[in-house]
Regions:
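Membrane-interfacial amphipathic helices and adjacent loop/beta segments
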Residues: 1-12
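Non-catalytic C-terminal accessory region of glycerolipid acyltransferases
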Residues: 11-153
Length: 153
């Protein structure tokens, strides 16, 4: 489902988004709203938004934590850091995302999928922000669950 990152969301797209949430098809969403950033030398997500929880509650859908292994170029992370240092709000590093995608050609990455979490179980973790942090920790924990990728010879 397309998401407009630079303005208001078209009402037809917003309606389509809501319709998909009440359907049966799994939906993969990136709750941070942006690609991960290099913070303190570690590639990690920015704080997660809570909209995925609101939609899950409204539709009574389970949440399945997912960790997508991967890394963008050092150039991308440097541009993102420079933009923040300069105080620019416009996400200029997004201009390089197509190039980043095509530079991944031929590379493999792994996707780790966790156990479903019923929304009724999430309420014990506090408010929506605390619940989002709980799901985020579950997703990041998945990276440590599997053996490292075998080295190529």
């Amino acid at each position: 489902i397309p998401v407009n990152k630079h303005g208001s969301q078209n009402s037809a797209y917003a309606r389509k988004f809501d319709e998909e949430f009440v359907g049966e098809v799994p939906i993969l969403t990136f709750p941070a709203g942006l690609c991960s950033r290099c913070i303190g030398g570690e590639v990690t997500d920015l704080p997660w938004k809570t909209n995925f929880l609101k939609k899950a509650y409204a539709s009574q859908r389970e949440i399945v934590p997912v960790f997508v292994e991967g890394r963008l170029s050092n150039f991308f992370y440097r541009v993102a850091r420079l933009r923040v240092m300069l105080g620019l709000k416009l996400n200029i590093e997004m201009l390089w995302l197509p190039d980043e995608m095509f530079s991944q050609k031929g590379r493999h990455f792994r996707i780790f999928v966790g156990d479903p979490i019923p929304v009724s179980e999430l309420q014990r973790y506090g408010g929506l922000r605390e619940q989002a942090e709980f799901v985020r920790k579950k997703a990041y924990f998945l990276e440590n669950m599997l053996a490292p990728e075998p080295e190529k010879r």
